[in-house]
A protein has these predicted regions:
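Membrane-interface alpha helices of multi-pass inner-membrane proteins
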Residues: 397-412, 423-426, 442-448
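Loop-to-helix entry region of an early transmembrane alpha helix in multi-pass inner-membrane enzymes
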Residues: 213-218, 296-300, 308-328, 345
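Membrane-proximal stem/loop segments at transmembrane-domain junctions that anchor or position
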Residues: 460-600
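Glycan-recognition surfaces in beta-rich domains, encompassing non-catalytic CBMs
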Residues: 13-243
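Membrane-interface anchor segments at the N-terminal boundary of transmembrane helices
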Residues: 206-217, 313-314, 553-655
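Short acidic/glycine- and proline-prone juxtamembrane loop motifs at membrane-interface regions
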Residues: 359-369, 411
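Extracytoplasmic catalytic/substrate-binding loops of multi-pass membrane glycan-assembly enzymes
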Residues: 176, 269-281, 289-301, 309-313
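Transmembrane-helix motifs of polytopic, lipid-linked glycan transferases
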Residues: 226-229, 317-338, 376, 380
Length: 713
């Protein structure tokens, strides 16, 4: 082990200790802004502020002590400060606080006499209905059936703290009048005259005082700059671990944070989150009437697991274990290559604290094991890359890779081209190991044939129906009709045979209007699919623009944020007035008793948080960060470019393969705006963040070692 000189100046250490105190104050205030509610000074708020303050002081001091012990080359300080500042600005901007609660709002309603009656029901501050006892009344109001009514000049005023989303509820109908509403200084007049009587809810997003925003942004930026700077200095100062033989299964410890947090989420949303797709597969597994519309292999796994314990929770636990073991195995492999265990724990915690993982891992979807398998493949490909292909030369490893690509091809139908293309890429990239790569490809083909051939026939698995199997073909034909493409008489007749020309529907966001069109003659396309594939290809050759537009429309999930197409995120629905205040199972089927939270106290606050991130109108920045697959891909590509700059090896592109091919296939053959389709890209992005931390640390240590050797010479 090379003893490095202690190059930290005493002034720098003193400055760091002063910054720790200020950082902890700013950090605890920033956390307070994230969690503040209507009651600004409560036991909960005090516990959060004090707890976060002492946590930051203790953690930062521990890291400073370690930095002083191991030493830190001061010349690297600029390399730390710049990314720390940029990340801090990013976090301070993208993580919004509940800042609206830090200012007092005044909401007033004035009836305009002579216009008619005003019926007012109440105010909701975004969290709850405001008690009517808090209203200040002026003029003559009648109060009956929890409603305020007046025909004369009268007013209602409420003063208090609220979220930035506030709503007022009135009644509209014949004879109703006009009211002047002041939304904390923003005045508008609203008429409630209507032909029919009904309830009307007026929503308003209240602006936050710019001074409060500046304070929040400044404290957040300072806190993150100092904390990230200390964290990076600590990581860089870590000495290279002594190379020793690791104990068998040493990597399993990294699964603990993930198993703990995901199990906690399962207890909150017990027995697991289930959509309509989940419940269809659950029913098939229990009736043992299998179809391949949802991959039959995944349904078989559900059948197998529920034969041990007949509960959705058993499936979720299996997903948690699969996820945690794959990630921890990947971390263990990096540690074998010299990564300090501290970075390993940081990677594990990164996966464990992600709200995207909290919600998705406990949802029973085929996309979850598929996405984890994509991550597993990426980890394996990094092993292949880092050994220049030699990893393939062991029979155990070849079988492992064959099983991995087999799972990818069986968990989702679009996984087959991913598996094939990656296998072919290995054959082309590593000539010395070509026979091993070919053997893996052959082994994969044999395994897949055994499952989809003899096994499926034995179990009488029904194939996909025509509307599923040829949905993309139908979608592209619909795109040509939407764009008024010029058709020959023969083409018009062939299209009319499938669906009458007047009944074709096109949506830029989903394939459902075509796939579930009641006029679709599925027998026609089933009996002669080649005919309609040729028809779609002919239309493309005649005029490719409608096809390209269709791909750009429905494939926007992959590469952009399309406000026209609302993404589907989760079956989790926030219901603040219900008991429980959320639903996470779409409907009830045999064997499913409904939502049965084991920790019901956490359901409301956690679901409220998720619900706000689901919306583009609430926590917009968190919505982009958590639920926009295009952001996953952009961050992934940026990190890959940084890794490529460090490694300077073109073969590194291999580890980008699973995410890139998956994204390309979804761009070309997407069917809906479901975020889960690209969940695998999110997991790979998190793994790339871990790779970057390791590569960054390794590169700095290598440079330091080289400079020391040059100095000796």
């Amino acid at each position: 082990m090379i003893n490095r000189a202690k190059r930290i100046s005493k002034n720098l250490i003193t400055l760091m200790h002063l910054q720790i105190f200020l950082m902890s104050i700013c950090g605890s205030f920033w956390i307070y802004c994230l969690t503040v509610e209507e009651n600004m000074i409560s036991r909960r708020s005090l516990a959060i502020v004090l707890g976060s303050f002492f946590f930051f002081v203790f953690t930062a001091n521990q890291m400073i002590t370690a930095i002083k012990k191991h030493g830190f080359p001061q010349k690297h300080l600029n390399k730390v400060l710049i990314p720390a500042f940029l990340l801090s600005v990013f976090f301070a901007m993208f993580i919004p606080g509940s800042l609206s609660y830090l200012q007092t709002r005044i909401i007033s309603i004035e009836s305009i006499p002579g216009t008619g009656e005003i019926l007012f029901e109440g105010i909701n501050n975004g969290d709850k209905d405001i008690p009517h006892s808090q209203f200040v009344l002026t003029g003559d109001w009648d109060y009956k059936n929890a409603q305020f009514s007046t025909n004369t000049a009268a007013g209602i005023t409420w003063t208090g703290r609220t979220s930035n989303q506030i709503s007022l509820t009135f009644q509209k109908g014949p004879g109703m009048g006009t009211a002047r509403i002041s939304w904390d200084g923003s005045v508008e007049e609203r008429s409630f005259q209507a032909d029919e009587s009904s309830q009307i809810i007026l929503y308003k997003t209240l602006p936050v005082n710019i001074f409060i925003k500046i304070i929040y942004f400044s404290t957040g930026t300072f806190f993150f700059t100092v904390f990230i700077c200390i964290l990076l200095c600590y990581v860089i100062s870590l000495p290279a671990p002594i190379l020793k033989k690791n104990s068998k299964g040493f990597w399993l410890k990294y699964a603990i944070p993930m198993i703990f947090t995901f199990s906690l989420m399962l207890m909150i949303y017990y027995p697991g989150i289930m959509s309509g797709d989940s419940l269809v597969q659950w029913t098939q597994a229990h009736n043992f009437q299998l179809t391949d519309q949802h991959p039959a292999f995944h349904t078989l796994l559900i059948w197998l697991i529920t034969n041990v314990w007949d509960s959705p929770a058993a499936i979720v636990i299996s997903q948690i274990l699969f996820f945690s073991l794959v990630v921890s195995w990947g971390i263990g492999n990096l540690q074998k290559k010299g990564m300090p265990p501290v970075i390993g724990w940081l990677i594990s915690i990164l996966f464990a604290v992600s709200p995207v993982n909290w919600l998705t891992v406990i949802t029973i979807w085929k996309d979850i094991p598929y996405s984890v398998s994509l991550l597993w493949l990426t980890i394996i490909l990094f092993e292949v890359y880092s050994t220049n292909g030699k990893w393939l030369e062991k029979i155990r490893n070849s079988v492992l890779l064959s099983i991995c690509v087999l799972l990818i091809s069986l968990f989702r139908h679009n996984g087959l081209p991913v598996a094939i293309l990656i296998s072919v890429l290995l054959v082309l990239m590593f000539r010395k190991q070509r026979k091993w790569s070919i053997a893996i490809l052959l082994l994969f083909c044999i395994f897949r044939w055994m499952v989809t051939g003899p096994l499926y026939q034995k179990l009488e698995v029904e194939p996909m129906t025509a509307n599923y199997q040829y949905a993309t073909t139908l979608y592209h034909i619909a795109a040509h009709l939407e764009q008024k493409s010029i058709l020959t008489d023969q083409q018009s007749n062939e299209i009319n045979e499938l669906i009458p020309l007047d009944d074709w529907e096109y949506s830029p966001c989903s394939i459902d209007p075509i796939m579930w069109n009641p006029h679709l003659d599925q027998a026609k396309i089933s009996n002669n699919p080649l005919k309609y594939l040729q028809l779609a290809f002919q239309l493309f050759l005649q005029d490719p623009i409608p096809d390209l537009k269709a791909v750009a429309d429905i494939g926007s999930l992959v590469y952009s944020v399309n406000p026209q197409c609302k993404p589907y995120i989760s079956p989790l629905v926030y219901k603040p007035t219900a008991n429980p205040p959320a639903s996470w199972i779409d409907f009830i089927v045999d064997g499913i008793k409904g939502e049965q939270s084991k920790i019901p106290e956490f359901v409301a606050p956690l679901t409220k948080f998720f619900d706000r991130t689901f919306s583009l109108n609430s926590l917009t920045s968190l919505h982009f960060l958590f639920w926009c697959p295009a952001i996953y891909l952009i961050i992934l590509l940026l990190i890959f470019l940084l890794l490529l700059r460090i490694e300077k090896k073109w073969t590194l592109i291999l580890i980008l393969g699973p995410a890139f091919i998956q994204s390309l296939i979804m761009l070309l053959f997407n069917v809906a705006q479901d975020v889960r389709f690209q969940y695998g890209v999110y997991l790979i992005m998190e793994y790339f963040i871990g790779l970057f931390m390791f590569f960054f640390w390794k590169n700095l240590h290598k440079r330091e070692k080289d400079s020391q050797q040059s100095a000796r010479k």
